[in-house]
């Protein structure tokens, strides 16, 4: 719906998808890019089992449900995601969101089980969504996915409208 509601058409339209394709990103590189966000905050690298056991590319030999999800299989020792990653901006955001869940699992893995449930069902989702809010134009520029960061009133309003349509409309 954003394309028909964009307040200032064409202002600060960031074509991250084009950059991902032009730079030869694949499912693994996109996942590693999302992981690098967390390691840049001082969090540990994901365990090798994450990459061995996660489904990030749609298998050609069988049907799977491609809805993205994060899993804590063995009390934080075998975190996984299931996401049929496509090379586009939305999927890059979804990877950051899903890895938000994974890092949350990793951070509470040593807590007693009574403390592993969220205070509210929406809390876990809020963790992932908060991470996506950090995917600012400055962040995308540092990752080499955009050339310039346009700072203007119009660009700010467009970004806020897009965010409102993607996130705020779905709040309970």
Predicted regions and their residues:
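Cation-handling catalytic/transport regions enriched in His/Asp/Glu
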Residues: 1-172
């Amino acid at each position: 719906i954003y394309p028909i509601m964009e307040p200032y058409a064409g202002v600060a339209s960031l074509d991250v998808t084009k950059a991902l394709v032009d730079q030869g990103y694949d499912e693994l590189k996109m996942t590693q890019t999302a992981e690098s966000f967390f390691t840049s905050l001082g969090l540990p690298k994901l365990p090798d089992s994450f990459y061995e056991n996660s489904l990030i590319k749609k298998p050609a030999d069988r049907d799977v449900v491609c809805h993205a999800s994060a899993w804590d299989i063995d009390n934080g020792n075998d975190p996984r995601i299931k996401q049929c990653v496509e090379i586009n901006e939305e999927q890059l955001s979804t990877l950051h969101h899903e890895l938000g869940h994974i890092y949350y699992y990793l951070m509470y893995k040593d807590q007693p089980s009574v403390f592993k449930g969220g205070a509210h069902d929406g809390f876990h989702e809020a963790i992932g969504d908060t991470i996506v809010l950090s995917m600012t134009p400055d962040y995308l520029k540092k990752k080499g996915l955009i050339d310039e960061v346009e700072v203007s009133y119009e660009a700010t309003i467009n970004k806020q409208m897009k965010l409102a349509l993607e996130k705020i409309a779905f709040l309970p």
